[in-house]
Amino acid sequence: MTQDEMKKAAGWAALKYVEEGSIVGVGTGSTVNHFIDALATMKDDIEGAVSSSEASTQKMKALGIPVYDLNSVDRLSVYVDGADEINDRMDMIKGGGAALTREKIVAAVAEKFICIVDNTKQVNILGEFPLPVEVIPMARSYVARQLVKLGGDPVYRQGVVTDNGNVILDVYNLKILNPKELESQINEIVGVVTNGLFAKRGADVLLVGTPDGVKTFTTK
């Protein structure tokens, strides 16, 4: 089974967590694109979706899935999204696609976070994948200096502007032993919008596409 086939299996497996008549939170990325394809097969059974990125919004609209503004929605039963890394405590690094802030907002609203990945994303310790940090443009150099003090090597992601009009610093060489603490430390730096650690609001259910099928993990 190829990596993309494992992503597809995980994406389609998430469909069973979607409630009829509900509005579904939808993330961003290659694995989520498979979930969107799956969601389109039951578009007449749901009210619609809230999207974490312009890319996902465009894909859903093209498939006939109604997309709502989050501010007009009181409740999201589930949020389905991928991860760049996830550990066995369901802490994640996200933001490789630069949609981390909107992803974090939608995840905060949802009652249940379903994370869908292929098995290459599972790790023991977070940090091999560079940690994305969304930054107000004028604060980029200042924030980079503060991230160096935390032990990281920040690199400006050239040519990328987020859906919110900000820039991304990718922080390399972090061995993240306490994800919740580091998430807070980085978010306290003036000029940071948010960072790609999802530890305070981690996943509730993890669906992993493997060569042997989809494996399900849940928080204790």
Swiss-Prot record:
Signal peptide: none annotated. Transmembrane segments: none annotated. One of its GO terms (cellular component) is cytosol. It is an enzyme of class 5 (isomerase). InterPro entries: NagB/RpiA_transferase-like (IPR037171), Ribose5P_isomerase_typA_subgr (IPR020672), Ribose5P_isomerase_type_A (IPR004788). Substrate binds at residues 28-31, 81-84, 94-97, 121. It holds the Pfam family Rib_5-P_isom_A. The keyword Isomerase applies. Its EC number is 5.3.1.6. The active site is at 103 (proton acceptor). GO terms for biological process: D-ribose metabolic process; pentose-phosphate shunt, non-oxidative branch. Keywords: Isomerase. Pathway: Carbohydrate degradation; pentose phosphate pathway; D-ribose 5-phosphate from D-ribulose 5-phosphate (non-oxidative stage): step 1/1. One of its GO terms (molecular function) is ribose-5-phosphate isomerase activity. It catalyses: aldehydo-D-ribose 5-phosphate = D-ribulose 5-phosphate. PANTHER family: RIBOSE-5-PHOSPHATE ISOMERASE. Catalyzes the reversible conversion of ribose-5-phosphate to ribulose 5-phosphate. HAMAP family: Rib_5P_isom_A. Homodimer. This is Ribose-5-phosphate isomerase A. It comes from Shewanella sp. (strain W3-18-1).
